[in-house]
């Protein structure tokens, strides 16, 4: 969390900026690593969630593998402490250039999402005289009970291979000379809060599909159940570290597996969301015909989640908290400066009486925040500030 003791230092900085609580990051990552060891589960960090080098390097130092979804993420992971043999490469659209780069690195596996992709990897590996480790991403048709834009495991989604192609895939893998099949991969969605019900169903479905592949003569040595554990956007201080215990224990108790099968998960948001805050400042207070607006200097170019998903982020007036003026609650629409009507941080938010220059915090912004920022309207990219460097 952002400590008020740091307010004086932070208030002198030009806004907007990303603030990262490194103590919370370390506590979160260490908790996940400790529980994973206890339950015998491997972890691959979903690199797409946050690519600040300091954050990524700490995660890699704790023994995590890397889950990548582009060639550049693969190269970035390798350059920031992840050994190639624990890097997996997913994504529905891998280019030849990306595949060749990953083959040259000797990554752990390609998580393949189509028959054509497997044929291409087989051909490119043959040209290099190597064998590519591949895992088949399965679309298990499971509703993750989350936002439709981050649901990835239904037949209507573009991800993974559905059951009607299982036999085709199995025959391909038996005959491909340059593919080494190692296992099955699943990922059904993101920001999953119905943890026991959703993941227990995923585990049961995964075991059924493993049985089918093995009945057709393909040994499944690895089961990757993906990521998706949600965080508490409503009360980040009350629940700063996500419930890894429930996630891991559900997998441990519900997934039927052999002692020699490797099981892994891919946390991303759950590791980094709560340690990050987008700090911004009130430029203007505008009293409209029907509502009051707080116009901030951070916009949807910095944090696109509210505009893209209608995502909720808790908003706090840091100056009011520091000065002890938390009475006089008023209702505001908190908006950004970008020339789009969707550039809204929150509508009808109850906040202390706010004035020009107040420092504001958009909480739980460490995941899918800075990585999705842009220079739309030619606005600057916000820098990062780390708690242990103040």
Protein language model annotation of sequence segments:
Residues 1-132, 171-180, 211, 215, ...:
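A charged N-terminal "starter" segment
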Residues 4, 250-252, 260-390:
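Charged (often Lys/Glu-rich) extended helix/loop segments that serve as interaction or gating elements
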Residues 21-24, 28-31, 51, 55, ...:
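General structural feature for long, well-ordered alpha-helical segments within catalytic domains
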Residues 23, 46-52, 69-72, 92, ...:
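Active-site beta-loop-alpha junctions enriched in small/polar residues
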Residues 40-44, 63-65, 84-88, 109, ...:
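Structural preference for beta-strand elements that scaffold enzyme active sites
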Residues 56, 79, 99-104, 121-124, ...:
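Short acidic, glycine/serine/threonine-rich loops at helix termini
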Residues 63-65, 81, 91, 153, ...:
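Glycine-centered flexibility sites
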Residues 141-284, 351, 377:
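Active-site loop/helix belt of alpha/beta enzymes
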């Amino acid at each position: 969390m952002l400590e008020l003791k740091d307010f004086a230092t932070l208030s002198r900085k030009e806004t907007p900026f990303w603030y990262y609580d490194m103590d919370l990051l370390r506590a979160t990552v260490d908790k996940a690593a400790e529980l994973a060891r206890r339950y015998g589960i491997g972890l691959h960090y979903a690199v797409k969630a946050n690519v600040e080098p300091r954050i990524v390097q700490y995660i890699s130092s704790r023994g995590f593998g890397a889950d990548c979804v582009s060639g550049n993420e693969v190269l970035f992971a390798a350059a920031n402490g992840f050994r190639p043999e624990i890097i997996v490469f997913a994504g529905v659209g891998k280019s030849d250039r990306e595949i060749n780069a990953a083959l040259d690195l000797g990554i752990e596996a390609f998580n393949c999402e189509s028959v054509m992709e497997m044929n291409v990897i087989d051909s490119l590996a043959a040209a290099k005289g190597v064998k590519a480790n591949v895992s088949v991403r399965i679309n298990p048709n499971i509703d993750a009970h989350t936002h439709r834009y981050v649901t990835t495991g239904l037949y209507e989604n573009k991800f993974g291979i559905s059951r009607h192609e299982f036999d085709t895939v199995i025959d391909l893998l038996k005959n491909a000379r340059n593919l080494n099949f190692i296992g099955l991969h699943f990922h059904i969605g993101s920001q999953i809060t119905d943890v026991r019900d959703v993941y227990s169903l995923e585990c049961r479905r995964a075991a059924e599909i493993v049985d089918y592949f093995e009945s057709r003569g393909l040994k499944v040595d690895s089961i990757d159940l993906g990521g998706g554990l949600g965080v508490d956007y409503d009360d980040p201080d009350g629940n700063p570290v996500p419930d890894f215990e429930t996630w891991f224990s559900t997998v441990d108790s519900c997934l039927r597996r052999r002692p020699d099968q490797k099981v892994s998960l891919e946390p991303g948001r759950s590791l980094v969301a709560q340690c990050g805050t987008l700090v911004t400042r009130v430029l203007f207070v505008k009293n409209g015909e029907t509502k009051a607006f707080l116009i901030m200097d951070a916009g949807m170019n910095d944090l696109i989640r509210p505009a893209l998903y209608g995502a909720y982020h808790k908003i706090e007036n840091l100056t009011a908290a520091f000065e002890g003026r938390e009475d006089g609650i008023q209702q505001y629409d908190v908006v950004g400066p970008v020339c789009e009507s969707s550039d809204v941080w929150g509508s009808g938010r109850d906040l202390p009486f706010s004035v020009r220059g107040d420092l504001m915090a958009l909480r739980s912004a460490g995941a899918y925040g800075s990585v999705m920022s842009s220079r739309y309207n030619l606005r600057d990219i916000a820098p990062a500030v780390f708690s242990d460097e103040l």
